[in-house]
Amino acid sequence: MFGQTTLGAGSVSSSASRVFRYEVVGLRQSSETDKNKYNIRNSGSVFITVPYSRMNEEYQRITRLGGKIVKIEQLVSAEA
């Protein structure tokens, strides 16, 4: 019994499979944003898909680039 847990693989994978989409406004065009794999749209809104495990890092990066997150929504897979 020592070292055993009651958590199964299903409970671990549920957080690993969660994906969220950030809607961001106010990103400045700079040498840092030029490194992105996407262009900043003319409307000013950018949609960034982020896995649950990286939400904090992505939030910090967006803030550092001068952006503001206006909406966060969870993306639901078609399998569910």
From Swiss-Prot:
Pfam families per the UniProt record, alphabetical: CpcD
The keyword Nucleotide-binding is annotated on this UniProt entry: no
UniProt cross-references to InterPro entries, sorted A to Z: Allophyco_linker_chain (IPR011064), CpcD-like_dom (IPR008213)
Superkingdom of the organism of origin: Bacteria
One of the record's GO cellular component terms: plasma membrane-derived thylakoid membrane
Domain CpcD-like stretches: 17-75
Location(s), subcellular: Cellular thylakoid membrane
Role description: Rod linker protein, associated with phycocyanin. Linker polypeptides determine the state of aggregation and the location of the disk-shaped phycobiliprotein units within the phycobilisome and modulate their spectroscopic properties in order to mediate a directed and optimal energy transfer.
Family affiliation: Belongs to the phycobilisome linker protein family.
Name of this protein: Phycobilisome 8.9 kDa linker polypeptide, phycocyanin-associated, rod
